[in-house]
UniProtKB/Swiss-Prot annotation:
Keyword Transmembrane in annotation: no
Protein name as annotated: Dual specificity tyrosine-phosphorylation-regulated kinase 1A
EC main group: transferase
Species name: Homo sapiens
Modified positions (Phosphoserine) in chain numbering: S14, S310, S529, S538, S748, S758
Tissue expression summary: Ubiquitous. Highest levels in skeletal muscle, testis, fetal lung and fetal kidney.
Gene: DYRK1A
Function: Dual-specificity kinase which possesses both serine/threonine and tyrosine kinase activities. Plays an important role in double-strand breaks (DSBs) repair following DNA damage. Mechanistically, phosphorylates RNF169 and increases its ability to block accumulation of TP53BP1 at the DSB sites thereby promoting homologous recombination repair (HRR).
UniProt family annotation: Belongs to the protein kinase superfamily. CMGC Ser/Thr protein kinase family. MNB/DYRK subfamily.
Length: 763
């Protein structure tokens, strides 16, 4: 019999298993059949007895008394052992060491799968409520106040909606077929919201006013055919146009177009600005940029200005934050009153960009913009900065009264000293053009470049009072005949491009007749620029087509010489000016000599050009590259779709429309009342002779918007009073500016330019 000490030695903490391991395997099998309980009871004794019997068979029934006491402890240990061993790969130690990355991936998969499932379930739960909550205007609008466009829908039994070709902050643009006129049109659908409606009504009024004074569509302004309300949306019906000038630039890989083609664009734009400056219009576009200048036809150089959504009349200005940044004039940057001269600044910037392929002043913000202007043009005159509310945003005044640039806060951008980045070098006047790419080309001589540079410097005059005006720009030697007839436009076709298009196709939207396919949108940060025209086109590479662009030329027609008008002060006879644009109508103006405006030259050796884009990125294709076009406000963006056909159906919209934030209204005109600007603002351009009485008013009923500068009577703005002893002065044009056809042709400056419209950004 064992003693108590021996019994104590057999406790679980000190049991010796070696003698009994011979039956351990049998114990495992038996343990699998035993109840898993941590309480010991007499009910388990029979099982223990069975184990003992099994164990005795292995130990020859030796030490039976000891086994009787050890067996309960062995069974307990066996119960704690796993019945089956797990895969080593699932061991926690392995998961947290060798397979740690795999563990993290699994956690992410499980987590995000659950999150995605919950999100989908949540969407499913409120999908029905969402429709009920966000569909407005009896189900015709979405939650953004935009009309829900349905392809193939027919409006008013007249317009068949083809597709959405553009979308912006103002609303949308669709391509539609007009069954009545049997032509393609672009319909601008304004958002169903009061603020957008009000602004669009201003645009409609200005467009109708311009179209009223340009019934023959001679002056390069987009034609508003009609407008109507449809399901609470104001809809503007425009002619269809083609590519914009930014598309053209992009398709030259941003190398720029020839000086010849740049000249043709310049003449048409100056003519358009001259038209806008007529007293009964006095319209400031406020957002000129390449995106807002569209080709009428992809085969011709005729252009039109679009997007008057930001425009205003002189004296009716409502915005202070205007113009795309790259093209923003100094007076706008400095917070000064502005007038029509801001559009001339923008034009100067555009023309340089069209030839060089790159923006002259591509500022990332207003401070950067001003610094880049100063690099080229130097510090603005002190008399301007002294009056500028925002001068100290960019400059600091020294004790001696002079101004210097402020150092940038970040200190990252380093600029060239003021006025040291010469326009002479930017244009490559003596080095074969930009990058030397025009060396040896006809029409790109040093003399040609010197004329171009001089015109640009006059357009980029810091002082809006002395900045060249459209009338005098058209007289510049850059547009005059030279020994090389191919370098200017004076012998180019004088037929109105809009009329040519209409005559050749029967409609003003013929270029869009073959446009088809669905519209595409892609993201432009704008640009596109910004920043921002809605167009749709069917335009693959059309190398053959561009060779035909702008190729017609005609010998100038002998024009009647008008007698000198009465009423000019001074002894000098009035200057007779022949204005020829390609393919614009020839116009003879009789004007008083304005020496200060005609012969002035900017004090700085190089003038500044700045350029602001709508926020919209243009995505170039392949080697074309991308260029961001920042936009001045929450502007519409561009969208396009590319098809295989060559022709282009292009909406007239550049889609830089409404400002998302209304700035303080400014109704006071800037002080621009010098003799030169008087001629600028009041140079009538009409089909018939315009007669002015002593009060300067035409023999027509002027509306409240006509000649607002005269009505406001602001100091510094002459009211066109003529001496009482003189007769009425006549601004004369050739009656109904003749339209001519010709057969002579010159080589197209577009030869070799492969124009392909790639998707433009939309946001």
């Amino acid at each position: 019999m064992h003693t108590g000490g021996e019994t104590s030695a057999c406790k679980p903490s000190s049991v010796r298993l070696a003698p009994s391991f011979s039956f351990h395997a049998a114990g495992l099998q038996m343990a699998g059949q035993m109840p898993h309980s941590h309480q010991y009871s007499d009910r388990r004794q029979p099982n223990i007895s069975d184990q003992q019997v099994s164990a005795l068979s292995y130990s020859d029934q030796i030490q039976q008394p000891l086994t009787n006491q050890v067996m309960p402890d062995i069974v307990m240990l066996q119960r704690r052992m796993p019945q089956t061993f797990r895969d080593p790969a699932t061991a926690p130690l392995r998961k947290l060491s060798v397979d740690l990355i795999k563990t993290y991936k699994h956690i992410n998969e499980v987590y995000y799968a659950k999150k995605k499932r919950r999100h989908q379930q949540g969407q499913g739960d409120d999908s029905s409520h969402k429709k009920e909550r966000k569909v407005y205007n009896d189900g015709y609008d979405d939650d953004n106040y935009d009309y829900i466009v349905k392809n193939g829908e027919k409006w008013m039994d007249r317009y068949e909606i083809d597709s959405l070709i553009g979308k912006g902050s103002f609303g949308q643009v669709v391509k539609a077929y007009d069954r009545v006129e049997q032509e393609w049109v672009a319909i601008k659908i304004i958002k169903n919201k009061k603020a957008f409606l009000n602004q669009a009504q201003i645009e409609v009024r200005l467009l109708e006013l311009m179209n009223k004074h340009d019934t023959e569509m001679k002056y390069y302004i987009v034609h508003l055919k009609r407008h109507f309300m449809f399901r609470n949306h104001l809809c503007l019906v425009f002619e269809m146009l083609s590519y914009n000038l930014y598309d053209l630039l992009r398709n030259t890989n941003f190398r720029g177009v020839s000086l010849n083609l740049t000249r043709k664009f310049a003449q048409q734009m100056c003519t358009a600005l001259l038209f806008l400056a007529t007293p009964e219009l006095s319209i400031i576009h406020c957002d000129l940029k390449p995106e807002n200048i569209l080709l009428c036809n992809p085969k011709r150089s005729a252009i039109k200005i679009v997007d008057f959504g930001s425009s205003c009349q002189l004296g009716q200005r409502i915005y202070q934050y205007i113009q795309s940044r790259f093209y923003r004039s100094p007076e706008v940057l400095l917070g000064m009153p502005y007038d029509l001269a801001i559009d001339m600044w923008s034009l100067g910037c555009i023309l340089v960009e069209m030839h060089t392929g790159e923006p002259l002043f591509s500022g990332a913000n207003e401070v950067d913009q001003m610094n880049k202007i100063v690099e080229v043009l130097g510090i603005p005159p002190a008399h301007i900065l002294d009056q500028a509310p925002k001068a100290r945003k960019f400059f600091e005044k020294l004790p001696d009264g002079t101004w210097n640039l402020k150092k940038t806060k970040d200190g990252k951008r380093e600029y060239k000293p003021p006025g040291t980045r010469k326009l002479h070098n930017i244009l490559g006047v003596e080095t074969g053009g930009p990058g030397g790419r025009r060396a040896g080309e006809s029409g790109h001589t040093v003399a040609d470049y010197l004329k171009f540079k001089d015109l640009i410097l006059r357009m980029l005059d810091y002082d809006p009072k002395t900045r060249i005006q459209p009338y005098y720009a058209l007289q510049h030697s850059f547009f005059k005949k030279t020994a090389d007839e191919g370098t200017n436009t004076s012998n180019s076709v004088s037929t109105s491009p809009a009329m040519e298009q209409s005559q050749s196709s029967g409609t003003t939207s013929s270029t869009s007749s073959s446009s088809g396919g669905s519209s595409g949108t892609s993201n432009s940060g704008r640009a596109r620029s910004d920043p921002t025209h809605q167009h749709r086109h069917s335009g693959g590479h059309f190398t053959a087509a561009v060779q035909a662009m702008d190729c017609e030329t005609h010998s100038p027609q002998v024009r009647q010489q008008f007698p000198a008008p009465l009423g000019w002060s001074g002894t000098e006879a009035p200057t007779q000016v022949t204005v020829e644009t390609h393919p614009v109508q020839e116009t003879t103006f009789h004007v008083a000599p304005q020496q200060n405006a005609l012969h002035h030259h900017h004090g700085n050796s190089s003038h500044h050009h700045h350029h602001h884009h709508h926020h919209h990125h243009h995505h170039g294709q392949q080697a074309l590259g991308n260029r961001t076009r920042p936009r001045v406000y929450n502007s519409p963006t561009n969208s396009s779709s590319t098809q295989d056909s060559m022709e282009v159906g292009h909406s007239h919209h550049s889609m830089t429309s409404l400002s998302s934030s209304t700035t303080s209204s400014s109704t006071s005109s800037s002080s621009t009342g010098n003799q030169g600007n008087q001629a600028y603002q009041n140079r009538p351009v009409a089909a018939n002779t315009l007669d002015f009485g002593q009060n300067g008013a035409m023999d027509v009923n002027l509306t409240v918007y006509s000649n607002p500068r005269q009505e406001t009577g602001i100091a510094g703005h002459p009211t066109y009073q003529f001496s009482a002893n003189t007769g009425p002065a006549h601004y004369m044009t050739e009656g109904h500016l003749t339209m001519r056809q010709g057969a002579d042709r010159e080589e197209s400056p577009m030869t070799g330019v492969c124009v392909q419209q790639s998707p433009v950004a939309s946001s």
